[in-house]
Amino acid sequence: MKVYTKQELNTHSQSLTYDDISLIPTQISKIKSRTEALTNSNFLGLKLNVPVISSPMDSVTGLEMAKELSRLGCIGILNRFDSSLDSLLNSKNGRGIKAVSIALNTDLKTIEKIVEKKYMICIDTANANNKEVLKKTEQIKKKFDVKVIVGNIAHGESLYQLEDAGADAVRVGIGSGSVCTTSIQTGIGIGQVSSLLNIYHIRNEKKIKIEIIADGGIKSPGDVAKAIALGADVVMLGRMLSGTRETPGEVIKYNGQLWKKYRGSASFGVKMRNEFIEGEETMVAYKGAVKNVIDGISDGLKSSMSYMNCFNLDELRKTETFAILSNSSYLERLPKM
């Protein structure tokens, strides 16, 4: 069996996803217990306990989720549709959250209020390879001292332009979200592993100072570990956090089971218009407190690090031992009940 480096995966002939690869532990691990593996990191000047950011979707990150993730040492990006945003920006307090998403047409007065609260800004668009995104980023960075996240991209060719515009971090992934139908509807997109590696290598080769957010396609703590091992600074989660107590919306009881709504940002439920739809809407099982999900991610990530002999995330990002899985090899690892 061939053991692949990042560079070899990057030049692989096919587009790869998380399910196509696996990490290979080749060293004798010196980690006695997974508790020795540290998942803390620094993202755009913020200290995180776990490298997790919530997606600014209206069914994932409202004010309650943003505050709780902040308390847990993660980042929740308050979605731009949230009804509490105006009162939050006009209040004297407004603390407890770290980031807010905006649209391309968000006015400078609103942005100024966001900056005064010392929040990060996420320009929430489906495609950052767009001159309007570059123009908005440049406008914000020239006028304000604030960290700006842009997205999304699937290839690294535009990193130079994004850096010139002042972007501090970029969301990587087009069409890979669980309720996103962009790739099907438009024919656009690359497997997340291939996207991450392409952008990671271009960033390093050209010494571009933009942080990488792996956004989409992550279904498990193992996928989080893979994303970090592939060079991501943090991961952005939607589906994994959906259905938790802190997500917006009511808990619904149906057939004796508790559920909550989960939908894509370009779904009909969000747009409420009969225009081109690139997202789905569904119900997910109620999961209880988001703390349980974050704890599970932290435990799984630490366990992966202990296998890989990595005491911290910087060491995990230096991973150069990967396997490409056949379909049968992937199916073999699934539980058989």
Locations of the language-model features?
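Alpha/beta catalytic cores of nucleotide-metabolism and tRNA/nucleoside-modifying enzymes
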Residues: 1-29, 165, 187-214, 218-337
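Active-site entrance/lid segments in N-terminal catalytic domains of soluble metabolic enzymes
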Residues: 1-211, 241-244
